[in-house]
Amino acid sequence: MIKTVGCIFADSMEYGPFLSRAKEMGGKESIRRGNESVEITLDENGRSLRVIGVKCGIGKVNAASATAFLIADDGVDFILNAGLSGAVHGLKREDMIAATTYIECDFDLTAIGYAPGVKADGQKYLYEADKDLLDLAMQSKGIIAAKVGTGDIFLADPVKKEFFRNTFGIESFDMETAAIAGVCDKLGVPMLSLRKISDDADGDAYETYREMNERQEACLTDLLFNILKRYLKADSLWK
């Protein structure tokens, strides 16, 4: 049996460790819909997992389009996202999180009577991680389950950070996950986002984020491949 997973990364620094690991394993690079990509296959006990890594670019539109392309063009069975994010509440630098709930914090129809984040016509606006993928991630030591917010801003404003915390109850903030989750939810594709906390989403956020981003650490790639190995061994996910 063969399944396909799409692994989405925003920028070169986040994608780099995954690309290096994939190339060491014989991965083949290509361009998919304008995005850098690499593909490998993992095999175990008669099961094959086709793994497609994509560097989508920073922000919601880039993330959403890459997700839609992977689903439409490659028929992925599930999506994993990995990258850095800012701490909003209860987290600190170097923490590793598996995101449980996703919301677009910058979606704003308050001028026409909606609450912050709420979409018109009853459209869903709060998305949940796939339980099976989340369970696989939480088997890794030290992983923290957290609610994340997303927006097309690099969050470095303490006032806005506090507003997002109080309004949405988020613990972390990034620029892609809720967009990926929204596409996956609409198309019925399981997804999970994995994040490492790089900064405190405050006035010093850029410097601390840049310092961690430039290190190009392999910890998220390690976590991602551990999840994929567990997925291959999980009989209940291959029925």
Could you say what each language-model-derived stretch is?
Residues 18-19, 91, 109, 158-161, ...:
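Short, well-ordered secondary-structure micro-motifs
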Residues 1, 75, 92, 144, ...:
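Short loop/turn motifs at secondary-structure junctions
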Residues 51-57, 147-149, 194:
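Active-site-proximal beta-strand elements of phosphoester/diester hydrolases
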Residues 201-239:
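His/Asp/Glu-rich mid-to-C-terminal helical/loop segments that flank catalytic regions of hydrolases
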Residues 111-172, 178-187:
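Active-site rim beta-loop-alpha module in soluble metabolic enzymes
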Residues 102, 152, 195-198:
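Short, small-residue-rich loop/turn micro-motifs
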Residues 2-128:
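Metabolite-binding pocket within alpha/beta catalytic cores that recognizes anionic/polar moieties
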Residues 178, 182-212:
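Zn-dependent metallopeptidase/amidohydrolase metal-coordination segment
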